[in-house]
Structures are given as structure tokens and as C-alpha cells.
Amino acid sequence: MAESIDIRELNERIERQSSFVINLMTGMDQVIVGQKHLVESLLIGLLSDGHVLLEGVPGLAKTLAIKTLASLIDAKYSRIQFTPDLLPADVIGTMIYSQKDERFVVNKGPVFANFVLADEINRAPAKVQSALLEAMQERQVTLGKETFALPEPFLVLATQNPIEQEGTYPLPEAQVDRFMLKVIIDYPKHEEEKLIIRQNINGEKMEVKPILKADDILEARKIVRQVYIDEKIERYIVDIVFATRFPEKYDLKELKDLIAFGGSPRASINLALAARTYAFIKRRGYVIPEDVRAVAHDVLRHRVGLTYEAEASNVSADEIVSKILNRVEVP
């Protein structure tokens, strides 16, 4: 009984403290038509301290959404256009010799920002991708003999085009795993596209002003950590990830020859973090199974390796995750 009272009090507190989420979403809706899933995914990454990889054809508002979110928060934003001739120094910076001072001085790269948009990340060679992904993991950059901490909050939002293969360098599985979410962006609905046309041909450009400071996001992350996850939900999360490794143990023998490798413990951690933040966005103080299911595809689709047999049969990671969610017992 005492626990239910605690949960009720926590729920009321989270509902009060998460009110800024509505303001952020309203600000995003002023500029972005539709794309609710994209907006929610960006907020999950922001409040979970996790990086986001967006995949979709050009023109689906990926860059605009990221730029709008950065504008709503009074924080430093930078955009890196990844190209085949890009160098690691173009991303993280370098040491430049100053003839005036007769010494090397630090020239910090665009990665030193709160929001970093890595546009078309799969167009740059592996060594450039590695430079960014190492900064994502370590939250610091070494230039010369000095190590510089990246600003807080630090969020990388990367985009890639799934169609064009020529002149691209696919991200290795180990590096893709550093992204908390991989979000597939779909086309807008019919009515949404009519509204997009109307806004653009009328020259309507909505300008958004900052409604939060960078420190507010750091405080919000502390509040998110208070969202309650029951042991049954934790077990459910682990069961889902284990089913990607040992499908036969969950009566999914048909998946055994389709999965080359399953999710690592990082998958379980990120699934729990994302579900908790999703509950917070929905202004709830506790996680329910539907929260886990809502974020499972975005957390797992880039962490489930497919065999040649799966690729030959046109079976996607999303289909495998869907089968697992349908089979694993819900608490």
C-alpha cells in the first residue's frame, strides 16, 4: 500500500516537472508539420543523453527538425556536412602554429557544440566517422597533448540517406551501436503534405525563440532518472534483448537462421533508458510495457545483425523485432 502511495506522489511530481515538454513540442509543431515520431525521438535522445541516427530520403525535415530543437534551447549548434574529402581535423579541430606568438594554438572544430548535426554521416571515410564517434563516446577530444571536455549537454544527431550507395561509407556495426536510437523517417500523410505546400508557397517562415537554457536540460535529465521502472519491466526488457540472441529459447526457432548477432547489454540499457524517457514525455512517473514496445524498434533495429539468408529473403531487422515483441510475454 505504501508503495502505491509513493508511486502516486511520484506520478504527480513528474507530471508537474515535465510540463516543459509540452512547450518544446508546441515549438516544434510551429515549424515541423506532422513527423510526431521524429519529434518524440529527438526529445528522447535529448533527455536520455543519447545520440540519435536519423535515416530517410532527402526532404523529410530531418535537418529542419534538429535545427528547430536547437533553436528552442539557448545552446550552441553546429552543422557538419560530411563529404568524401573531409578530414578528422575538420570535425574535432587541430593545433595551428601562430607565428605571432611563436607557439601552437588550439583551433577547436565544430564538434565543440551542444547540438551537433552530422549531415549525411555515411558520406565521409571511416577515419572521419571514427573521430566523431570517439568524441561521442568519450565526451572529450584530444588535440596535441591537451584533452578538452565537450560542452554539456552534448548531443549528436546524425542523418543518412538509405537510397544512395555510390560514394558512401556504411557505418560499421560497432560504431552504429553508439547511437542510442536509429529512427526511420517516413513520408508525411496526405493532409500534412497539403499543409507543407501551403506554408512554403505562401512564404510562411516560423521563427522560434529559445524557451529553455542548456542547464534546464541537465536538470530535466535528473528528473527523468526518478521515473520508476518495476522489476517486472526490467525482466521484460532483458527478455526482449535475450530473444535477439537466443530466439529458440523463446519459441522463435524460425529466427535462429536469420539473426547473425543479437543486441549487447548496451541494447538492454538503452531500451530501459528510452522507455523511461518516453514515460516522462507522456508525463507519467512510471514505465509500462507499452513504453518499452513504443521505443523497441528504434533501439534495436541497428543492433540486430542479419544473416545472408535474411537479406536474401528480404527480412528486415524491424520484422524480427516485431516477431519478438509479439512472442515475448508481456508482464
What are these regions (language model features)?
Residues 57, 91, 159:
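P-loop (Walker A) phosphate-binding loop of NTP-binding proteins
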Residues 1-14, 247-331:
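C-terminal engagement/docking regions of AAA+ P-loop ATPases
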Residues 46-83:
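Walker A/P-loop
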Residues 110-137, 151, 166-175, 187-195:
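Conserved AAA+/SF3 P-loop NTPase catalytic/coupling segment centered on the Walker-B
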Residues 13-18, 31, 168, 182-254, ...:
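Conserved C-terminal "switch" segment of AAA+ ATPases
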